[in-house]
Amino acid sequence: DFNAGDVANAPDRPRIVGDAVSHYRKLAHKRPAVAFCVSIADAEKAAERFREAGYRAVAISGESDPFERDRALTGLRDGSLDVVCNCALWVAGVDVPSVSCIILLAPTKSLTKYLQSVGRGLRTHPGKDDLIVLDHVGNVARHGMPTDEREWTLAASVKKRGATERSEVPVKTCQKCFATVAS
């Protein structure tokens, strides 16, 4: 996968996170959201940026006290939190059906990690009609749409698409509304 330190220290990192906050405000304002960040420090900075913009946001990680992690989960469920920023903690094994926005701030070469991250928002929930994915790191272009059909096999003879190869289904992004669709 990408080197987390290199990504977190990239010169344009503050702009990427800032854009995530403005795009959340524009496209998913107040929707329960989970942001996937590259490091614990990155998650803390992202949560701080969301709080500065007036959102109720926290950062959690594997180093967080279990009570803090439970409180974040409860906060998304009961609406007392808007955004939970995490670093590799909620990729799998967490079920918060009310989440209707996923914010991708961590690039990954792993299709599985990408699909599991987006999957945190694909649960059905009363009153939830859709999921908004704010991809600020090119994971959709890298792996395709989460809903793309994929051939899964255990056969060793089938050549699998390499982790760094581009998606077989090209995507394009509207520069006005930032919607990404298969092209």
Spell out what each predicted region is:
Residues 1-38, 157, 165-166:
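Conserved interdomain linker/interface between the two RecA-like ATPase lobes of SF2 helicase motors
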Residues 22-26, 49, 75, 120, ...:
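A generic secondary-structure signal
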Residues 25-32, 53-56, 97-100:
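Short, surface-exposed connector motifs at secondary-structure boundaries
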Residues 34, 42-92:
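Conserved helicase ATPase core of P-loop NTP-dependent helicases/translocases
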Residues 61-63, 106, 137:
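Residues at the C-termini of beta-strands that transition into short coil/loop
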Residues 78, 111-116, 120-183:
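C-terminal helicase lobe
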Residues 82-109, 113-120, 130-135:
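A short beta-strand element within the Helicase C-terminal
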